[in-house]
């Protein structure tokens, strides 16, 4: 029986990255594409509970897709329970245009949020992201994003093939894959842990023509991190693979908390 794969992202169903992701798994089984109709970066694992959702079926570059009027997590939920009507064997979220590394992105990335939603149903999940060297590229029209995805496609294909055959190791719900911008066929692969920080958060205040203030959440990237982290791997030009668990319980002796009670 052919494997069933659900493909989603957070950059939107028309983004170049999801077409590359489709190429990475199209030979591994039946691929269902269910992704946001609009750009949804930074929404994390949010779901729409105060408005109805609509599905638009269309074809993009010969690929049948389902454009969801909601978040990446909405897209996974509708993909499983309305479109496929069964659990897939694998969920792939990506390729995100922009790296998703450090604890900063685990809770804010729609790419990772969608993968975590699938993982919550016991489905092995992969999130795949591509580093960009200019931050502004993340905010451009990603339909026409130009990049050679071939190395990333080949790498994700190999990982997905093995996950479909063997599943994920115990206590691993998601593999967070980040591909460096200048990746090569022989680029080193590192199994990494999450760096603590990647962004130095700030707020920029501006004034509208009437003199009233408005604000942009901004900040700079942090380019230094401990050895063994995803940020460090990407800075070295290595492919980063971080195993993620849904269980966010701190691995400490609970007696250390008792004095706070």
Curated annotation (Swiss-Prot):
What positions does the entry give for a divalent metal cation binding?
10-11, 41, 96
**Is Chloroplast a UniProt keyword of this protein?**
no
Localisation: Cytoplasm
Provide one Gene Ontology cellular component: cytoplasm
Q: Which cofactor does it need?
A: a divalent metal cation
The reactions it catalyses are: a ribonucleoside 5'-phosphate + H2O = a ribonucleoside + phosphate
Pfam families, per this entry? SurE
Indicate the secretion signal residues: none
How is its cofactor bound, per UniProt?
Binds 1 divalent metal cation per subunit.
Q: What class of enzyme is it?
A: hydrolase
Quote the EC number.
3.1.3.5
Q: Which GO molecular function entries does the Swiss-Prot or TrEMBL record give?
A: 5'-nucleotidase activity; metal ion binding; nucleotide binding
Q: Cite the SUPFAM superfamilies for this sequence.
A: SurE-like
Keyword annotations:
Cytoplasm, Hydrolase, Metal-binding, Nucleotide-binding
Q: Does the record's keyword annotation contain Iron?
A: no
* Main function: Nucleotidase that shows phosphatase activity on nucleoside 5'-monophosphates.
Which PANTHER family would you find in this protein's record? Answer: 5'-NUCLEOTIDASE SURE, PHOSPHATASE, PUTATIVE (AFU_ORTHOLOGUE AFUA_4G01070)-RELATED
Q: Which family does it belong to?
A: Belongs to the SurE nucleotidase family.
Name this polypeptide is given: 5'-nucleotidase SurE
Q: What is the originating organism of this protein?
A: Methanococcoides burtonii (strain DSM 6242 / NBRC 107633 / OCM 468 / ACE-M)
Task: Cite the source lineage.
Answer: Archaea, Methanobacteriati, Methanobacteriota, Stenosarchaea group, Methanomicrobia
Q: Which gene encodes it?
A: surE
